[in-house]
């Protein structure tokens, strides 16, 4: 910028405005006029261009660029290259090559210096040009216009110089970008080489096992703590070398493949040693625990709890990392270990279960068997119901009142419990026992309790409930009560048990191949060992459609192990359920409630749940519902089989006993309105009520149409039923209460009309016919009808004077007292309704008599009201 010749050309323009000329002359006075001669612009275009090129100031380039064109373009000097070429043929060519490279590096540094200097120069030029334009503003425009007018040729030269300089700058920019591109490529290559070097180091470290690790894998020492720790660490190193996922392509390297083949041989050998070690531990533990069981049983007889075996679990947990490694690295060798584990511990667990249940049976309180046949016609049943009725009439039933006297102390000091309380205690102990064993199996064999998928029903939800489906189940069971079939089932069950005792391992070591999930409905499942009395009830029913096969899970053996270990739990629990059914079927409801509380608790997806515990309780739940539905069917059959006369029958026994049945059931109902036990109770009410209504309708249909007992029996029984349901005030019975009230009112109207017709039928018929005539005739024409003339009117009213009306009401009252139960408030209800209907009719008769005959009835409606009151007071119920 210092050598540009602007000032000479600008000073000769002769600008009139001193302000702008002074600024420009001051700015460019530093340049000499000799550097730029405007007279030379008259030359030819080519000469002018060459002249400008010669007058453009030359920047100071680096030393290697200041040489001749040949030297700059060809890099190093000819002498250097020739000497280098000559020296390449000599023995010391390596040193000359090094000199060439050093020269190249020095030249590269000069390029960097040049690039930096050019950048600074360009920045200065751009800044000064922009500042000058902004400061000059209008003055610049005037100067340019004057320059264009007076000497445009000078600007042409300046423009050419600027274009040349721009071209040089563009070339320099391309050169700089070229250099930067090479530098970037070199940097990328360097970075990739570093990453490759790092990955190769990692691969070498991963594919290399130390000598100690190899010796441990080859000859592990499991007997001492240090050797076991070294074996676990060596197993982890081997696992990492075999399973770590390498970068793309590295796993296909021949060296990696060969090394992993060697590691596979280590894995196979080490897995075989681990499997043998764990199997020996299981066998040893089996013997030790067997001795422990014998010792503790002899020392603490009658102890109502399960042994914990914590010290043996702690011993086995030391080898847990090796078992977990074996499952992940060689799962095929784990399968025989699971079978060995089952064989080692199943016998011990079966012994624990039998001992526990036999021990708690000693604390069972003896109770007399009471089937509570509320609707049976036997004398013992009537006696039992009468006692219940007396108890409920003198005391208010409370929730779970049976628990107040559920336990007592016997002569031997053992705490006595009722069967339902004993069942609850057994469930609490079983939960702890099973959860402890399950947690150990899950931790030791690295299994997870499979969570239930969202939207899927639990595997226990298919058990028979107390809803509408239970009606069908009950009807199916009703046809299966023959004693021969029960005996046959019990015999078959006994044969199966004997066979199982002879060959305990034949059916108790199911295959674990392929980790197939366990089907609880399979005949081989140990949880299907239910009592013969239950299996016989479902023998002739068609099998339900098979459920869709569950998805296979790697954790399915967990259920298999637990099923094999605790195959005696379900039969023991069902045995307690059957004993409770024999003593008091209502105990089944409390058992069902307790069972479902555990099912709900273990159906939640948290850390403390057991799908297996839910499964075995679901079988118990199903058995409880089956037995209770069977009890209900006994009650239904008792109702159906009852044949009785409806003549002056009063309230039938079955209708009288229903509220007692309800009160007893309510004692065993849970406080919450949800749950299967509540649904079962409510469905029981519905089933019995519908059967009662159908049974009474069946008895009524057998009577002739003209029999008064058809409506009298319905009237009295449904009135009693309505009052009792109203007294119970149970929400689920509201609909049935309304139904009984409707039937009662319907038959009340029929009976009242029947009573009126006993003595007042002619009067009713006379005025009924008159109402029909009034539909077509005016009231004044009625007296001209032969059937309703004034003479006929006088005859009819003469028959129903005061004394005759009183006799008619006496006869009606006598009929009511004769057919309705003594001291029943229904008598007064009927009498009051009779009074309402009769007076309503009589007042209507008075109105049409006045309209048609212009006369009055001999007895007024007020007099009739007095007659009703007098008759009822003078004639109390005498029968």
Curated annotation (Swiss-Prot):
Residues 541-551 have a biased composition (Pro residues). One of its GO terms (molecular function) is phosphatidylinositol-4,5-bisphosphate binding. Residues 165-187, 226-248 form a coiled coil. GO terms for biological process: exocytosis; Golgi to plasma membrane transport; protein transport. Disulfide bonds: none annotated. InterPro entries: Sec3_C, Sec3_CC. GO terms for cellular component: exocyst; Flemming body; plasma membrane. Its main location: other. Residues 29-94, 371-413, 455-557 are annotated as: Disordered. Residues 40-52 have a biased composition (Basic and acidic residues). Residues 64-76, 519-532 have a biased composition (Polar residues). It is found in: Midbody, Midbody ring. Transmembrane segments: none annotated. Keywords: Coiled coil, Exocytosis, Protein transport, Transport. Residues 480-500 have a biased composition (Basic residues). Residues 77-91, 373-409 have a biased composition (Low complexity). It holds the Pfam family Sec3_C-term. The exocyst complex is composed of sec3/exoc1, sec5/exoc2, sec6/exoc3, sec8/exoc4, sec10/exoc5, sec15/exoc6, exo70/exoc7 and exo84/exoc8. Component of the exocyst complex involved in the docking of exocytic vesicles with fusion sites on the plasma membrane. Belongs to the SEC3 family. This is Exocyst complex component 1. It comes from Dictyostelium discoideum (Social amoeba).
């Amino acid at each position: 910028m210092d050598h540009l010749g602007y000032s000479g050309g600008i000073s000769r323009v002769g600008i009139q405005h001193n302000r702008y000329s002074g600024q420009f002359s001051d700015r460019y006075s530093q340049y000499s006029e000799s550097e730029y001669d405007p007279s030379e612009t008259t030359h030819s275009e080519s000469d002018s261009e060459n002249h400008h090129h010669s007058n453009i100031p030359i920047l100071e380039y680096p030393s290697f660029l200041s040489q001749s064109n040949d030297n700059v373009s060809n890099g190093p000097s000819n002498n250097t290259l020739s000497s280098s070429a000559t020296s390449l043929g000599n023995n010391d060519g390596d040193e000359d090559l090094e000199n060439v490279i050093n020269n190249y590096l020095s030249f590269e540094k000069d390029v960097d210096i040049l690039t930096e200097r050019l950048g600074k120069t360009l920045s200065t030029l751009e800044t000064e040009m922009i500042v000058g334009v902004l400061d000059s503003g209008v003055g610049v425009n005037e100067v340019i216009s004057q320059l264009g007018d007076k000497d445009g040729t000078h600007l042409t030269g300046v423009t050419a110089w600027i274009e040349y300089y721009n071209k040089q700058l563009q070339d320099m920019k391309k050169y700089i970008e070229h250099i930067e591109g090479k530098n970037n490529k070199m940097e990328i290559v360097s970075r990739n080489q570093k990453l490759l070097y790092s990955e190769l180091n990692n691969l070498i470290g991963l594919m290399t096992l130390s000598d100690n690790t190899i010796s441990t894998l080859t000859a592990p020492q499991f007997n001492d703590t240090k050797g076991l720790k070294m074996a676990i660490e060596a197993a982890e190193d081997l696992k990492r070398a075999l399973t770590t996922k390498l970068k793309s392509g590295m796993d296909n390297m021949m060296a990696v493949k060969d090394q992993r083949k060697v590691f596979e041989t280590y894995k196979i050998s080490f897995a075989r040693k681990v499997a043998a070690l764990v199997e020996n531990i299981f066998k040893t533990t089996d013997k030790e625990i067997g001795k422990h069981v014998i010792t503790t049983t002899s020392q603490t007889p009658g102890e109502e709890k399960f042994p914990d075996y914590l010290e043996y679990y702690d011993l086995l947990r030391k080898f847990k990392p090796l078992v977990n490694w074996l499952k992940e690295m060689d799962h095929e060798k784990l399968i025989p270990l699971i079978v060995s584990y089952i064989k080692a511990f199943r016998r011990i667990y079966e012994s624990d279960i039998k001992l526990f249940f036999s021990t708690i049976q000693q604390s069972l309180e003896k109770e007399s068997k009471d089937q509570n046949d509320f609707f049976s016609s036997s004398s013992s049943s009537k006696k039992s119901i009468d006692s219940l009725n007396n108890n409920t009439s003198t005391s208010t039933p409370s929730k779970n009142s049976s628990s107040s006297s559920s336990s007592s102390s016997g002569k031997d000091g053992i705490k006595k419990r009722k069967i339902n309380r004993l069942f609850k205690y057994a469930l609490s102990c079983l939960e702890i026992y099973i959860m402890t064993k399950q947690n150990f199996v899950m931790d030791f064999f690295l299994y997870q309790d499979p969570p239930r998928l969202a939207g899927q029903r639990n595997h226990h939800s298919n058990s028979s409930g107390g809803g509408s489906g239970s009606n069908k189940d009950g009807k199916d069971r009703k046809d299966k009560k023959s004693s021969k079939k029960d005996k046959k089932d019990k015999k078959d069950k006994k044969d199966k048990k004997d066979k199982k005792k002879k060959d305990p391992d034949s059916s108790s070591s199911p295959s674990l191949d392929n980790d197939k999930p366990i089907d609880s409905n399979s005949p081989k499942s140990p949880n299907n060992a239910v009592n013969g009395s239950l299996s016989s009830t479902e023998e002739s029913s068609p099998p339900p459609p098979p459920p869709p096969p569950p998805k296979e899970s790697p954790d399915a053996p967990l259920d298999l192990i637990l099923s094999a270990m605790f195959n005696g739990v379900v039969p023991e629990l069902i045995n307690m359920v059957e004993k409770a059914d024999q003593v008091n079927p209502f105990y089944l409801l409390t058992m069902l409630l307790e069972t479902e509380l555990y099912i709900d608790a273990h159906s939640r997806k948290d850390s403390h749940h057991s799908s297996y515990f839910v499964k075995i309780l679901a079988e118990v739940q199903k058995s409880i519902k089956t037995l209770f539905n069977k009890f209900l069917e006994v009650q239904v059959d008792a109702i159906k089989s009852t044949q009785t006369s409806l003549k002056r029958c009063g309230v039938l026994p079955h209708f009288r006993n229903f509220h007692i049945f309800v009160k007893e059931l309510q004692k065993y109902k849970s406080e919450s309105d949800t749950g299967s036990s509540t649904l079962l109770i409510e469905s029981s009410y519905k089933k019995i009520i519908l059967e009662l209504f159908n049974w009474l309708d069946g008895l009524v249909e057998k009577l002739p149409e003209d029999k008064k007992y058809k409506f009298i029996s319905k009237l009295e029984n449904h009135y009693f039923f309505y009052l009792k349901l109203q007294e119970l005030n149970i929400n689920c019975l509201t609909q049935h209460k309304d139904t009984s009230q409707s039937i009662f009112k319907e038959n009340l109207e029929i009976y009242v009309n029947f009573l009126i017709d006993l003595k007042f039928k002619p009067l009713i018929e006379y005025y009924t016919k008159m109402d029909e005539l009034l539909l077509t005739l005016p009231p004044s024409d009625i007296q001209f009808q032969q059937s309703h003339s004034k003479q006929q009117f006088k005859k009819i009213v003469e028959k129903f004077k005061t004394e005759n009306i009183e006799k008619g009401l006496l006869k009606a009252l006598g009929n009511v007292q004769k057919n309705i139960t003594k001291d029943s408030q229904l008598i007064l209800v009927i009498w009051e309704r009779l009074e309402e209907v009769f007076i309503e009719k009589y007042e209507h008769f008075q109105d049409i008599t006045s309209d048609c005959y212009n006369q009055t009835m001999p007895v007024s409606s007020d007099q009739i009201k007095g007659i009703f009151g007098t008759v009822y007071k003078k004639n109390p119920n005498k029968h």
